Amino acid sequence: QNNLSFSSYTSVSSLRSKIDVLGAEDWVKARQLMASETGDLTFLDENFGAATDWQNEIFRTGVTQNYSVSASGGSKSSNYLFSLSYMDQEGVVINSGLDRITGRLNLRQNLLNDILILEANLTAANINNQWAPVGNGGGAGGDLIGNALRANPTMPVYNGNGDFFQPNTTTFNPVAMANLIDDRSQTDSFLANVAATFKLAKGLTNKTNV
């Protein structure tokens, strides 16, 4: 009897909550208050007129899609199982995620009136990861999330010509960091096992694996 099956599912993940930081209007008021007390008017050069929520810019709702197909069947003396699955997972940080393809093939054959049993199990996988520059992944630019929390909310994401806006400060444009720092990995794996089981006598067998 042969069987064919297919399954799929979709799920979403998102940030549970954001960290409270000053919005553009409150940031300007706070800098004005500081200036009235210190006389430091440099904040006027740092007010770029935008109202950017940097956490909204770098976080998203990540969608995960998974698809699987399998076929199995056989007879009294032989059987097989083949399966193939694909997963595409978006991270909750922009430009991060994982996609994975996995295939498996299992074969079994009984010979000589079940005195000899041959089995083969094969598994192959391809995994691609794209990492967001969080933690040390940000390199000299620092941590992406830390930059998003420190970033000036009056700073726009893009300048007038469509390039990423970057002022002359120690805080990097978080969206630029997420897009320009490319941290990827690819893993390919293949596992194979072949076994032969020989029934020497009732209750006595010898199995060899390769």
List where the protein language model places each region.
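Outer-membrane beta-barrel transmembrane strands
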Residues: R60-S78, S85-M87, P174-V210
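Surface-exposed loop/interface segments of Gram-negative outer-membrane beta-barrel transport/assembly proteins
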Residues: N3-A51, V92-I94, T102-S189, K207-V210
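Short, P/G- and charge-enriched loop/turn segments at secondary-structure junctions
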Residues: W54-I58
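Fold-independent oxyanion-binding glycine-rich loops
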Residues: Y9, L84-S85
